[in-house]
Every structure is written in C-alpha cells, then in structure tokens.
C-alpha cells in the first residue's frame, strides 16, 4: 500500500515531499508492534496516512487541496473469499468533494506561420500538429516545433537554401507537387514477407536443380545460424516463419513455373512470328520426354525460351509429338499461322512423312519452313577420312579403352604418371556420341605416349604402335585437325545463333581447309602445332605417303562440307549488312526496297548497326521502319542448331536422377531453361492465404 501511495504522489509532488512521506510511514510501521492486519482493522494506518496527506497538502502551495478518501473495502480487509490485503486504487478528492485524478499532460506545441521562414509547414491536426519540411517532405514530431530545431534541420539538410526568404518557401509550398496528399506506406506483414521469402528460396532451389528437401534440411538452418551470429537470436527466430518443407517447395516451384508460362504465352500472342526447335529423348525412368523451344521477338530483342516440356505416354511417334504441341497451342490460343520455321534433328520421329510432327506442323502452318540442325551436318561431314588415318583413329580408341575399361589399370597408370611427373594422370574416355571431345581425347593420348609406353604390357598387341614414328605422326595430325574442327563447332553453339553465323563459320573453315592442304603439299606443318612440335622433337620429316593421306583428308573434308553446306545465291544478304546493298534484292518488293534506302540513309541507324548485334539491330527498327524490319526479323527467327535442346536434356538428366525418378521435372525445366524471371509479388498477391505451413 505504501508503494501504491508513493506512486500516486509522484505524479503531483516533488522528490523531497515523497521522501518525507516515505520516511514517516516507515517510522510508523516500525514503531508499532501490532500486525499489519490488525492495524488495518483498527483504522490506525488509515488515520496516519490521512494525517500525513493533510500535512503534505497544507505544506504545498498547490491550489488543488485534497484529502485522502478511501472506501472501507479498500483499506479494510475483505470479509469475502478474496485475498486479504487487496487494495483498490487511491483517489484524491478536491475541496468540492468531486473526484479528480492528478496526471501530467504532455506539452503540445502550436504551429506558427513564422516557421515557414525555416522551410516548415504543419502536418496533421492543427491543435497538435507535426512539422513537415516543404523541401524534403520529412515529417518531424510535435516536439520539434521550435525555431532552433527547425533552423538546425534547414542548415544541416538544406544548407543551400538557408539564406532564402519566406517567399521562396511559400512558393515551394504552393506548388502542385506539395499539394498532393501523402501516399501511405504499405508495410508487409510478417506472413507476407515470409511467403515472399519462401518463393525466393524455392526459385533458387529450382534453378540449382537440387532436391526440395534441401530448403528445410540445409538452407533454413544455415540462414538461422548466419542471422544469429551476425545480428541477434531474436531476428533468427523470424526465419522459422519461412516455410521450406518438401511439399511447400514443390507447390512454390509449380506456382513460379505457371507464372513464367503465363508471361510467355502473353508474349507469343502479341509477337509477329516465332520459330520452333524440338527434340525427344528418354529419361531415367524410361519416359519419352519432349522438349520444344521457341524463338520470338519481344520489345527490342529476339528472345529464346522453353515452350513446353512434356512426357509422351505411349509411342514417341510424329503424330503424338504433334498432338502434344498442338494441344498446348490450342489451350493457350496461340496461332499456328505465326510459326515461320521448325528445326529438328531429322530423326525418324521428327521429320520425313506426313504422319510425323514436322510435316503436320507445316500442314497447319503453311507459311512455315523446316530446317535440319547444322551441327549434325558438320558432325557427319568430319567422319569421312582415308583408310590409313581411320585405322590410326580406331587403334587409338582401342588403346584408351584398354586402360579405361579396367579400374585397376587406371589406378596404376595414375601412380606411374605422378612418379614420372606427367602433366596429366589419366586418359579421357572416347565415345561415338560425344564427338565434340574427340580432339581432347587424342591430344591427351599423344601427351601421355611416354608414360603409356612404360606402362603397356608387351603382350598387348597395340603396344608397338607407341614406338612407331609413322603411327605417332598420323596420331599427332588427327589430334590437331579434330581440335580445330571442335573449335569451329563450339563457335556455332550458344544462344541467338543465326543461319548467317553458321554459314560464316563454315565459309571460314572451307577457306582454311584449302590453305592447310596447300601448306602440307609444300611440307609446311606450322598450321598443326602438335605435329610440328613432334617433328622437331624427333628431328625428322614426314613421309610422302603420310603427306598424301593428310592432303587427301583435307580436300575430301572440304568437298564433303560443300555438299552439306552448299554455296547458294542468298537473296537475304541485305539482312546481314543493309549498308552494302546497291541493287534491289529479288526477295524485296519496291516498297520494301524504298524503306531499305531510307534506313541506310539514316546516320543514326548506321551508328546503331555497328554497336548492336544483328538480332537487336533489326528488332529495334520495328517502330520506325516496320515493313522492312519485320521481313528481316522473319529471316533471323529460324534456329540454326539444336543447342538449346541438347542443353535442356543435360539439365533434365541432372535434375531427374535415379534417386528422384518420381519427380515431375517439367516445372523445374520451365524455371531453369527460361529467360523470364517470375513475378513473385504478383504470385503472392493472388494468394488468399498468405502463409501456408505445409
């Protein structure tokens, strides 16, 4: 009770008065030997407290004279079953016997018009206003309505305007910008933030191709540990609200993929045209998987994206492939008439007869053309070679397989290479499917020839090849030529590769082949570094039969490439460089050629041509020169290679492994192979329930 009384007095009296009351009450309680309950029953404590309060009030000069009033049930012990000693709050009564409660009221500052000279107006209620700077719109508390504080804000935050008069700030205040009502700031709730964070983490899980369980088992604990160490345990507990369970991540990934698909469909509906690239393969569970990529113009660039990833339930025939693609197009109301080209690998299920996919697509899209992957043409062309070189290649593969097929032999070879200080410790496995690695395989075999000579058992029938200089000369040449061919092949891969890019690379290769053949005829082998270094090492020359075989191979390779990549009179060369055109191309009508003349006469367009890629250059001219630019984009849309499908199947195999055979990989492929970033804010706004725990 004493503490309760002192608390009430602290609102109305200074510290000295409170200390005086406390000392007198303490002395009274210590001098009386009776229990506290008895004092309350007798009323002694009540009388003593009243006496102290009368004395305090009389000594103070406050106009509010009060007497301590308390009802019997407040100061006397209750006779009911309630706990004894329970006291209600103490009230002061004024001299007119009206109940009043003494409390400190906060001081409210008023706004004065002179404060505008410091650049401040008022904001909110006129009786209790806040100070608002007319320059930076910052709102200060009511306590800041003091000239010194307002002047300090002006001099520190807006020193350039500290010498301005009040008319300047009045003009700034009356501007339309300042008359706009302040936009309320929308603050996300914890559930909204946790949901958005869950979508962000799920997006990165899908991009990495990891299992869904990694969110709850690894990412979430690591995030909590980092936040706890860097900030505080209180903040780390908020991470518990981010749901990353297996089922939650799976749902999030499906939502993200659906948002990307929705955006892609909207783009295809408004584009002028698109081209397709499709391929089919089997996954780890034995399902036939169809990948279809699309190339289209969007804004001022040509984009490439995954159109669909579907599992074929029965036979992977051309009809079923077409039905799968056609169902997607009809479901999303995408017009087949916009399809300008279909690129395939020319397999039996993809191209050929009317029952197959490409022919059926051309039937529903009469303006569409079909093309064969140019990389496969190149791969077919390089397989042809003279018998002497073919035998060396086959024997080299047999030597490699003799080592790689026996793990024990591979381990022993590694130990030997380490002891001999070799640069490499293992051979590379050669496969017919991975024809791009053939150059690296042969180079590695040639570099480890000394170690293999020591390692090889004399009983192995091909061990003598490593001591035959003629055999090694042919091997060195094959290592060089396949390395060069692989470099050309890799340069034709990647995104936004056009037919012009591929034919430019092939034209360069054809000229190089003729140059290499002429150099070999003159016994100049500088074009082949491995062969040239080996000749210097053994201090020897190349026999005429070897030179003849090399020249025959180079010339035969050139003629085969000409067969697969014939030189034609292309009427679309104006697309490659419109500024070199002096005569009307046959593929253009008079109106388009006039537009081309206007385009090539524009100096700004000429500058953009040197700065932008070919795809971006023509896409950027759609608004200014729509007719000729659309014709150029239509020429650039067709795919030249199957690079996207090959890359897509590699990602698919890495995502759907033997440990995740039941996984629906389509949403993961949509996220991983798409250039479109999902709009997570839009996805969360569609959710009626912001936070789902499982």
UniProtKB/Swiss-Prot annotation:
The keyword Nucleotidyltransferase is annotated on this UniProt entry: no
Gene Ontology molecular function: DNA binding; zinc ion binding
Pfam families: zf-BED (PF02892)
UniProt signal peptide: none
Positions with a binding annotation for Zn(2+): 133, 136, 153, 158
Source domain of life: Eukaryota
UniProt xrefs under InterPro entries: RNaseH-like_sf (IPR012337), Znf_BED (IPR003656)
Chain intervals annotated as zinc finger (BED-type): 109-165
Keyword Ubl conjugation applies: no
Keywords from the UniProt entry: Metal-binding, Zinc, Zinc-finger
Residue ranges the record marks as coiled coil: none
Cross-referenced PANTHER family: EPM2A-INTERACTING PROTEIN 1, LOW QUALITY PROTEIN: ZINC FINGER BED DOMAIN-CONTAINING PROTEIN 5-LIKE
Miscellaneous information on this protein: May be derived from an ancient transposon that has lost its ability to translocate.
Protein name stated in the entry: Zinc finger BED domain-containing protein 5
Originating species: Canis lupus familiaris
Gene that encodes it: ZBED5
């Amino acid at each position: 009770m004493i503490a309760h009384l002192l608390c009430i007095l602290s609102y109305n009296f200074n510290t000295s008065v409170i200390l005086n009351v406390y000392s007198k009450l303490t002395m009274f309680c210590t001098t009386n030997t009776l229990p506290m309950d008895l004092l309350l029953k007798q009323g002694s404590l009540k009388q003593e407290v009243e006496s102290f309060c009368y004395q305090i009030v009389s000594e103070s000069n406050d106009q509010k004279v009060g007497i301590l009033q308390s009802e019997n049930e407040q100061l006397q012990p209750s006779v009911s079953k309630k706990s004894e000693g329970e006291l209600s709050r103490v009230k002061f009564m004024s001299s007119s016997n009206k109940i009043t409660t003494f409390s400190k009221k906060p001081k409210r500052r008023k706004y004065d018009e002179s404060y505008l000279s410091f650049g401040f107006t008022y904001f909110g209620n006129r009786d209790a206003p806040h100070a608002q700077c007319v320059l930076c719109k910052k709102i200060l508390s009511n306590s800041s309505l003091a000239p010194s504080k307002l002047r300090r804000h002006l001099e520190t935050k807006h020193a350039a305007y500290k010498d301005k008069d009040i008319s300047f700030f009045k003009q700034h205040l009356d501007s339309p910008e300042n008359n706009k009502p302040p936009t309320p700031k929308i603050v996300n709730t914890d559930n909204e933030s946790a949901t958005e964070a869950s979508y962000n983490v799920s997006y990165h899980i899908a991009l990495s191709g990891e299992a869904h369980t990694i969110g709850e088992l690894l990412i979430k604990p690591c995030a909590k540990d980092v936040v706890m160490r860097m900030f505080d345990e209180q903040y780390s507990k908020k991470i518990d609200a981010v749901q990353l369970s297996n089922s939650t991540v799976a749902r999030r990934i499906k939502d993200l993929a659906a948002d990307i698909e929705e955006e892609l469909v909207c783009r295809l509906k408004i584009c002028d045209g698109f081209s397709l690239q499709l391929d089919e393969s089997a996954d780890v569970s034995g399902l036939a998987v169809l990948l279809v990529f699309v190339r289209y113009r969007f804004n001022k660039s040509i984009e490439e994206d995954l159109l669909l990833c579907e599992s074929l339930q029965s036979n992977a025939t051309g009809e079923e492939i077409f039905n799968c693609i056609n169902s997607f197009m009809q479901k999303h109301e995408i017009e087949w008439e916009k399809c300008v080209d279909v690129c395939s690998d020319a397999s039996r299920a993809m191209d050929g007869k009317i029952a197959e996919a490409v022919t059926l697509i051309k039937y529903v899209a009469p303006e569409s053309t079909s093309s064969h992957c140019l990389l496969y043409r190149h791969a077919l062309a390089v397989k042809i070679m003279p018998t002497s070189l073919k035998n060396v290649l086959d024997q080299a593969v047999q030597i490699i397989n003799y080592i790689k097929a026996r793990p024990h032999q591979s381990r022993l070879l590694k130990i030997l290479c380490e002891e001999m200080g070799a640069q490499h410790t293992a051979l590379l496995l050669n496969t017919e499917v991975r024809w791009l690695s053939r150059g690296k395989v042969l180079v590695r075999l040639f570099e480890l020839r000394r170690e293999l000579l020591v390692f090889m058992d004399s009983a192995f029938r091909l061990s003598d090849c490593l001591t035959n200089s003629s055999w090694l000369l042919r091997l060195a040449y094959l290592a060089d030529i396949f390395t060069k061919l692989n470099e050309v092949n890799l340069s034709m891969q990647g995104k936004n590769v056009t037919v012009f890019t591929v034919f430019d690379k092939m034209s360069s290769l054809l000229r190089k082949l003729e140059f290499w053949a002429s150099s070999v005829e003159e016994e100049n082998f500088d074009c082949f570094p491995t062969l040239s270094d080996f000749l210097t090492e053994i201090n020897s020359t190349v026999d005429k039969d070897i030179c003849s075989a090399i020249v025959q191979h180079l010339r035969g390779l050139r003629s085969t490439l000409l067969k697969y990549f014939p030189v034609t009179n292309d009427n679309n060369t104006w697309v490659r460089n419109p500024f070199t055109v002096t005569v009307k191309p046959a593929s253009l009508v008079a109106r388009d050629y006039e537009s081309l003349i206007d385009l090539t006469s524009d100096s700004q367009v000429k500058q953009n041509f040197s700065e932008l890629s070919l795809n971006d250059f023509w896409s950027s001219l759609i608004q200014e020169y729509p007719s000729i630019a659309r014709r150029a984009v239509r020429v650039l849309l067709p795919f030249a290679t199957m690079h996207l499908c090959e890359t897509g199947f590699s990602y698919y195999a890495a995502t759907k492994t033997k440990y995740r055979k039941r996984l629906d990989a389509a949403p993961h492929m949509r996220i991983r192979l798409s250039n479109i970033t999902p709009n997570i804010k839009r996805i969360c706004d569609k959710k009626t329930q912001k936070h789902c725990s499982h």
